[in-house]
Design a protein with these regions (language model features):
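A generic local structural motif
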Residues: 2-5, 28-30, 48-50, 108-109
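Generic signature of intrinsically disordered, low-complexity, basic-rich segments
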Residues: 31, 88, 136-138
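Residue-level signal for secondary-structure boundary sites
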Residues: 42, 87, 130-132
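Short, structured beta-strand-loop surface elements
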Residues: 48-128
Length: 142
């Protein structure tokens, strides 16, 4: 499946800054690993993570290429998050493990098991047309 333009910057990107929003609207950015498949991107976290709690309250997020520390290195796109279950979650897990075999094939699952944390898989769907950019000035310049 061909990758849509909004997600192309993330295909080779190992880490992105996922910005979620507190109830009062303040943004919180977190570095997460990402995998892209066509029209969707996938990330994982654990069920008790702050970002997951914020996503359950507000599924609108921003995603930007970033360093491993979560410092944005490119423009953000807006996206809607959906929590996956069953076969969809398994498919997302496989895509993430394929892109990040050591980190998400061994280390993250081991860490979640040792701490008793439940892993959740999330699907990100870009908003705002083909480019998904969050800043109208960025869209005008493109």
């Amino acid at each position: 499946m061909e990758t849509i333009p909004a997600l192309r910057p993330f295909v080779q990107q190992p880490t992105v800054r996922l910005t979620t929003y507190r109830r009062d609207g303040r943004p919180v950015g977190t570095a997460v690993s990402i995998a892209v498949d066509g029209r969707r991107a996938y990330v994982r976290t654990f069920e008790s993570a702050g970002k997951f709690k914020r996503i359950r309250h507000n599924p609108l997020v921003e995603v930007a290429p970033s360093t491993l520390r979560g410092e944005a290195t490119g423009p953000a796109i807006r996206a809607r998050v959906r929590v996956l279950a069953g076969d969809e979650a398994e498919r997302a897990r496989r895509l993430i493990v394929r892109k990040h075999p050591l980190l998400h094939g061994v280390l993250v699952p081991l860490g979640h098991r040792l701490t008793g944390k439940k892993t959740v898989h999330l699907e990100l769907t870009p908003l705002e047309g083909a480019d998904g950019r969050s800043d109208t000035r960025e869209r005008a310049a493109a």
